[in-house]
Regions:
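Extracellular modular ligand-binding repeats in secreted and cell-surface proteins
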Residues: 264-339
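Sec-dependent signal peptide cleavage junction
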Residues: 21-34
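A recurrent domain-boundary module in secreted/ectodomain proteins
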Residues: 241-264
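Short tyrosine-centred short linear motifs in exposed loops/low-complexity segments
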Residues: 41-46, 52-56, 89, 280-283, ...
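Secretome/extracellular-domain signature
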Residues: 73-178
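Bacterial N-terminal signal peptides
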Residues: 12-24
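Bacterial N-terminal signal peptides that target proteins for export
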Residues: 1-13
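GGW-centered surface loops in extracellular recognition modules
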Residues: 33-67, 140-141
């Protein structure tokens, strides 16, 4: 278990996140740092158990839609929000795939004149408080979904030497982007999903009329169009009843989807410790301090919660200081709370 109280991070701007993380990865679940956990595409449900009470940032990226020979599928969307969680809570994570996993539409029964086959809408990525599998299974339990990033729409099919299929719409974001037309009057692009409208909850449309591309998965999936147009991207979603500071963006993710969870703890010290701690087996250290005119917080007993790790319980706090750093973790400090 990680340090329960000693976390300090900075939250960087959405634009920086979006640009820095526009990459593709097929890696399985990994732990990126002591205060963050990352999840990549696996084709199934993954889970994360909250290690300690506190506030966390949830970030999700949807998958890119499939490419045609001449045009690209829409990039996956992005969403983020903050949530207070308790130790032992479990969140369930599903990462969208470029193969349509988690709601992307399919077009496996068609191919273009160049042999391009199997264009899919990108799958959505979501985090929920229960395990019901793919997003579409929450249609009667939407309140259990915390956050969604839409998948990009698939490109329309091309015709050799004559027509080029339209590009896929970007994944959401509040709304998914519309697909692109192939330029003919009767080419109708697929519409992107919205907050309360789209092809279907959790699912993008499969192949539309006359070689149109499929829709991306999302809160509401993108629609397919007509005559080689691109499919619409799926919409994203932030559950504002449970998350704060929500934000979404369109079209920032190449390849499969992605999820990152970051601890947002920040702790400061308000008083000096004037006695060395006494260690106890249960991991609680107790401090006392004497009152003074310059240290109003003194006169109380302080306790320090020691994480269940192999830290040396004999390490003492230097007298007259505000505490000591976590062994081997410069810049990270144990937090003391007034009892």
């Amino acid at each position: 278990m990680k340090n329960k109280w000693g976390r300090r991070i900075g939250v960087f701007a959405l634009a920086a996140i979006s640009s820095a993380l526009m990459f593709s990865t097929n890696a399985i679940t990994a732990k990126a740092a002591d205060n963050e956990w990352t999840y990549s595409y696996t084709g199934g449900v993954q889970s994360w158990t909250v290690p300690y009470n506190g506030k966390y940032m949830l970030e999700v990226w949807g998958a890119q839609g499939g490419n045609d020979t001449h045009n690209s599928g829409g990039l996956g969307g992005y969403g983020c929000g903050k949530i207070a969680l308790n130790e032992g809570d479990v969140l369930y994570i599903v990462i969208g795939g470029t193969n349509g996993y988690n709601g992307g539409g399919t077009s496996t029964d068609n191919h273009d004149a160049y042999g391009q086959m199997n264009i899919y809408g990108g799958g959505a990525s979501h985090i929920a408080t229960t395990n019901r599998g793919v997003l579409a299974n929450y249609v009667s339990n939407k309140s259990e979904v915390l956050i969604v990033a839409g998948g990009g729409g698939g490109a329309g099919f091309s015709s050799e030497g004559v027509y080029r299929g339209g590009y896929g719409g970007s994944g959401g974001g509040t709304n998914g982007g519309n697909g692109g037309s192939m330029g003919e009057d009767n080419s109708i692009p697929g519409a992107g999903g919205a907050q309360n409208d789209g092809y279907a909850f959790g699912r993008g449309a499969s192949l539309g009329g006359y070689y149109a591309g499929p829709g991306g998965g999302g809160w509401y999936g993108g629609k397919s169009g007509y005559n080689r147009s691109g499919g619409g991207g799926g919409s994203g979603y932030v559950n504002t009843g449970k998350l704060t500071d929500g934000s979404m963006a369109n079209g920032v993710r190449l390849g499969n989807g992605y999820v990152k969870i970051t601890a947002l703890h920040t702790h400061t010290y308000t008083s000096k410790i004037t006695t060395n701690p006494t260690c106890t087996k249960d991991g609680i250290r107790t401090y006392t301090c004497t009152g003074s005119a310059t240290d109003a917080a003194c006169g109380h007993q302080y306790t320090e919660i020691i994480p269940k790790l192999n830290h040396d319980c004999s390490v003492v706090v230097p007298l007259g200081t505000k505490g000591y750093e976590v062994p081997g973790r410069p810049g990270y400090f144990y937090t003391r709370k007034c009892s």
